[in-house]
Amino acid sequence: MITLYGINNCDTVKKAQKWLTAHSISYTFYDFKKQPLTNELLGQFVELNDWSTLLNKRSTTFRNLSDEIKHNLTDDVIFEQVLAQPTLLKRPLLLIEQDTAQNQQALHLGFKADNYQAIFQ
């Protein structure tokens, strides 16, 4: 099962969707603007990648955080902020579940055609 997470109006997410469709790869799209980010889902992301790769510090949302929050970025604070503002995550997030019985999953961040080509070869 393949799930692409992001927001529908993000150009990078659109590129990933276009690439997946052009290569006849079926996927489910999870739009953070229409579906809430849950504790469970965010916890799953954190298990697969750490905050240093998940958090988009170049985003407008991050830049708009108060200095107090930016200087107190503990795991709990980040978790709380990302739940409230999922646009703090890098996009898109591509979750591939290879074997649900064995709980084998991979989470890929961002989109580059070469990377997607390597993932799906």
Task: Annotate each language-model stretch with its function.
Residues Q35-Q121:
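Thiol/selenol-based redox catalytic cores and closely related redox-interacting motifs
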